[in-house]
């Protein structure tokens, strides 16, 4: 007979066996996951939260001390939006090592100087050590720091190539980069997911101008030339040195001009020569032409000063010019008119992107009347215009001169008017009228005619600065001077009739002959509206690459280069 106790034993043994089996089934995957550290197991759940927490903490702080410029608060929202869709998963790391895309991107960051940028802004020299540390440490915190560091550096690089490092509004320039800003999280996700064409994809966000690409090529050339610059200075001659004169620096000037390409390599200059002549004079003329100097071959103080500028400084001029190209809009509704202030030059572009018209200009005085940098649209022309004296000139010049000489206004073909244009006085000025002028109740304008300060035509593009293009009664010889920062802020045109005809070329009735008649024989203050506004850019670039590849350098007449260089030296976060 079987007892109750003996019958219960098989059940108890089965129960024990079942629980042992169940424990084994559950335990094996956990162990496997912990061993492999892969995706989808409890081990991954153990590891991913730690990495995720580290990523979140680094992003939320907006600061990463591993970076050369640790504060990335200006990019914090973009970085967070980049990681959020993936649940804060690592982007640049796979199997405890940088991904192929990470290595490709770092190589581009390390070569940022070819774009006129500073590789150290993107930790260029730090990535080799980071790669080695990442592959040896296997630390979740280290992986998170690496990943966030690369994300921040890549975002900075993309933004810098696209719109520049510093917002031009920081310098009170009227240029808008906001419309060009990229959706950085979206763009970067595309960049990471695409397996080919990284450099081509990045090239799509660069300024599309041929001038930008030419300037970048010139930068590469001058970076190499700067390596050969020994820094030795040319001696200043005792006075202006003409062809045939004696000069102790013949060997040095020949070496300098050969290096930068103005003196042919095969030009024969005796090593012990002390005579300034022949090929050297021709080379100096070429140099002068490229540096905004009168190309007469005279070795002047200004010429020697420009020859002594270190080539590293020329490299910096090219870099700053590339930065300013990034501030410009990338497309235009009509071919634009562009005025480059340091060059004293205007260019009007055709639909094919070629220069259709170019001329010299005079710009605002460097001390009191700097012409501002901004963009607008030319809307109309006024032939034989009045000159409405700007408040500043009225206050600082016309009123004091009138107080000393009550005939000043009539002698200068001016008249006093009410704000709505009603003439109050055009003869000697009374005390009452002078008092109203001082109080701002009356204003002054100059009558139309060849002696008018605006000449015979003005070209209007609305702006807060009261700046426009116009003719001038001054001698045409002034447009061949080296220094042409001479105006009260407006831009004087060397060939005003040609620009007027160019702007009106879509109006068949306004041929060049009619433009000339309107200027010299037409009605006073006659307005002609353009069919469509023509974009105009007033820009500032001290390095210019011509269509033939010739590189030209100009003086920093307003100190804008110095201001930009100083601001860039401060590092991130740059003013946005």
Name what the model sees in each region.
Residues 1, 20, 284:
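Conserved S/T- and glycine-rich ATP-binding loop of Class I adenylate-forming
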Residues 15-27:
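Bacterial N-terminal signal peptides
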Residues 4, 25-28, 32:
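Serine/threonine-rich, low-complexity intrinsically disordered segments
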Residues 1-12:
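N-terminal secretory signal peptides that target proteins for export/translocation
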Residues 115-179:
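Mature extracellular/secreted ectodomains of secretory-pathway proteins
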Residues 102-113, 150, 157-158, 215-218:
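Short, Φ-rich (hydrophobic/aromatic) sequence segments
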Residues 32-78, 82-84, 148, 152-156, ...:
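Well-ordered beta-sheet/strand-loop patches within structured domains
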Residues 1, 32-133, 137:
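Zn2+-dependent metallopeptidase catalytic domains
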């Amino acid at each position: 007979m079987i007892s109750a106790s003996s019958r219960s034993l098989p059940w108890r043994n089965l129960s024990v066996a079942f629980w042992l089996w169940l424990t084994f089934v559950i335990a094996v995957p956990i162990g496997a996951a912990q061993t492999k550290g892969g995706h989808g197991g409890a081990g991954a759940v153990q590891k991913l939260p730690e990495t995720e927490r580290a990523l979140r903490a680094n992003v939320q702080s907006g600061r990463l001390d591993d970076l050369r410029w640790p504060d990335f608060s200006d990019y914090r929202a973009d970085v967070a939006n980049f990681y959020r869709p993936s649940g804060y998963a690592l982007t640049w790391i796979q199997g405890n090592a940088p991904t192929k895309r990470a290595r490709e991107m770092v190589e581009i960051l390390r070569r940022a100087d070819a774009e006129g940028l500073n590789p150290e802004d993107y930790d260029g020299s730090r990535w080799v050590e980071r790669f080695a540390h990442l592959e040896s440490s296997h630390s979740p915190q280290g992986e998170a720091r690496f990943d966030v560091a690369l994300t921040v550096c890549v975002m900075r690089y993309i933004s810098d190539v696209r719109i520049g490092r510093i917002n031009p509004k920081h310098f009170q320039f009227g240029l808008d980069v906001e419309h060009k800003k990229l959706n950085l999280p979206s763009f970067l996700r595309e960049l990471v997911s695409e397996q080919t064409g990284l450099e081509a994809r990045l090239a799509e966000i660069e300024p599309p101008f041929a001038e930008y690409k030419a300037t970048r090529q010139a930068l590469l050339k001058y970076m190499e030339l700067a390596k050969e610059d020994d820094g030795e200075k040319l001696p200043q001659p005792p006075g202006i040195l003409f062809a045939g004169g004696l000069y102790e620096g013949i060997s040095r000037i020949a070496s300098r001009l050969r290096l930068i390409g103005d003196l042919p390599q095969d030009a024969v200059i005796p090593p012990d020569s002390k005579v300034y002549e022949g090929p050297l004079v021709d080379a100096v003329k070429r140099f002068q032409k490229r540096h905004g100097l009168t190309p007469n071959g005279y070795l002047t103080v200004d010429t020697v000063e420009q020859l002594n500028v270190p080539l590293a400084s020329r490299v910096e001029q090219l870099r700053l010019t590339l930065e300013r190209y990034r501030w410009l809009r990338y497309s235009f509704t009509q071919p634009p008119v562009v005025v480059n202030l340091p060059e004293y030059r205007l260019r009007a572009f055709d639909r094919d992107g070629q220069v259709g018209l170019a001329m010299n200009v005079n710009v605002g005085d460097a001390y009191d009347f700097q012409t501002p940098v901004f963009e607008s649209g030319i809307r109309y022309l006024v032939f034989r215009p009045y000159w409405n004296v700007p408040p500043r000139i009225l206050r600082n010049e016309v009123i004091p001169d009138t107080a000393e000489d009550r005939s000043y206004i009539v002698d200068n073909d001016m008249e006093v008017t009410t704000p709505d244009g009603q003439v109050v006085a055009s003869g000697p000025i009374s005390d009452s009228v002078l008092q109203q002028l001082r109080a701002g109740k009356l204003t002054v304008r100059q009558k139309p005619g060849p002696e008018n300060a605006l000449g015979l035509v003005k070209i209007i593009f609305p702006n807060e600065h009261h700046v426009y293009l116009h003719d001038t009664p001054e001698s045409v010889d002034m447009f061949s001077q080296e220094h042409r920062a001479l105006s009260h802020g407006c831009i004087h045109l060397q060939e005003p009739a040609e620009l007027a005809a160019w702007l009106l070329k879509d109006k068949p009735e306004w041929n060049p002959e009619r433009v000339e008649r309107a200027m010299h024989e037409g009605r006073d203050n006659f307005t002609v509206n353009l069919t469509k506004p023509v974009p105009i850019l007033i820009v500032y670039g001290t390095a210019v690459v011509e269509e033939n590849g010739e590189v030209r350098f100009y003086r920093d007449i307003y100190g804008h280069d110095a201001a930009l260089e100083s601001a860039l030296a401060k590092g991130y976060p740059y003013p946005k």
